Amino acid sequence: VKLTTPAATQKMTATFTGDVLMTPIATGETPSRVGVALVRFTPGARTHWHVHPMGQVLHVTDGTALVGTRDGAVVRARAGDTVVCSPGEEHWHGATADAFAAHLAIHESADTADGGTSPVTWLEPVSDEDYQRAQA
């Protein structure tokens, strides 16, 4: 058993739209490949489309989060709710247009072709049109 201190909070820019802060909470010790982060979104902020080869679990800690999939389905998750994104499912998540949201993001890294590991493959930004449709 060991007590750890979370890493420094980072402002996320390259694969997010709007203001998003991420605090890495923990990374499992080898052979574990689990990672946990607290992600905070300002109103209107969201991830780009992305996919987790091993899946992702989102546990909403504050506000209401939106989680959208390529088929147009949107889950509206409130504080205390948990959303499971299946392995390989392209999705995005973020805050509603008018309120803050925060969630714990839990993922597992997978082997990559170059011999490394990665928990995520980032894709293009979520269009404003797709994001607005998710507000309904």
Where are these regions (language model features)?
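A short, N-terminal "cap"/entry segment at the start of jelly-roll beta-barrel domains
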Residues: 1-34, 119-136
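Membrane-topology and secretion signals of cell-surface/extracellular proteins
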Residues: 11, 18, 47, 110-111
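Conserved short histidine dyad/triad with adjacent acidic residue
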Residues: 22-24, 35-52, 87
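Short, conserved beta-strand element in jelly-roll/cupin
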Residues: 38-42, 51-67, 106-109
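Short beta-strand His + acidic residue motifs that chelate non-heme Fe in jelly-roll/DSBH
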Residues: 47-49, 67-68, 85, 90-97
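A short hydrophobic beta-strand segment most commonly corresponding to one strand
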Residues: 57, 84-85, 98-121
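Short acidic-glycine-tyrosine-enriched beta hairpin
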Residues: 71-88
